[in-house]
């Protein structure tokens, strides 16, 4: 059987692509080396932030606004919401370049963002402590996503729509010819007109020339109480320290507050190098500078986990066809800020399989930018 689209890697982007392409009437085969959702890829742990006024650059705003529409639609397929509108407060020095980008994005796209000085911040959320030179940019319409629920929902909807799914079966080789794309797996060979490579952190095992660097990252849960929960209107947050370190975190659930450090980490080359949480001496203390100064009421570390970023050289996404192979789309290099975009990236992949022109300017995400 020849498929219209084969998806290599069925985590967040691949799961979304499988659903949207199958819903559009295409014959789709989703593959994964493991059984998604799993803990081997870039994303695991149950929550991910979604921010609209985007500190990483205005080029992302149209994508994240479309993603929000798709998240809201996906949430209708479950009793438990996938998106929780907790609000997100971005904290940092008043001269922060990241916060300047957030403010610029908000102004250009007329987003609901409120600017608070240090006094106003600490009045609204007495749990937060910041220096006098800090500000907060509060996005009331943003919040967080239940990531594993999202992936399982896409997988279920795709399967119910007739999508073929081949999991626990790594792809060992990809072949291109005039008739399309052939993949080799432990279960045999499969052929399609087009392919999506969304293999996340370990994409270089299949496409070694891609400029993607895996980085081991950790996050942890700390003892909290009801003051830090959504029931008390405590928001999700990003925070920049005076030395430039970037942190992110979520409202407490079951008296546990999850926090991670966005920058830093350990460069690795293979999956077995991703040691578990606490295997690196700094793991347990990584969040202390932020917690001690900004959230001093939070208690000790309860447990943690390790994940992996698939970093591009400039930490912007890679969304492009493989050089010399216009029938194969690669979505990678999401650099630790990609999950919130998963539905729109999946939709872009489905449009690629349908032969449609993208609805967005993807020029900033082309591979050619690295050869200029």
Curated annotation (Swiss-Prot):
It holds the Pfam family DAO. This is N-methyl-L-tryptophan oxidase. Monomer. It comes from Salmonella heidelberg (strain SL476). Catalyzes the oxidative demethylation of N-methyl-L-tryptophan. It is an enzyme of class 1 (oxidoreductase). Its cofactor is FAD. It catalyses: N(alpha)-methyl-L-tryptophan + O2 + H2O = L-tryptophan + formaldehyde + H2O2. Binds 1 FAD per subunit.
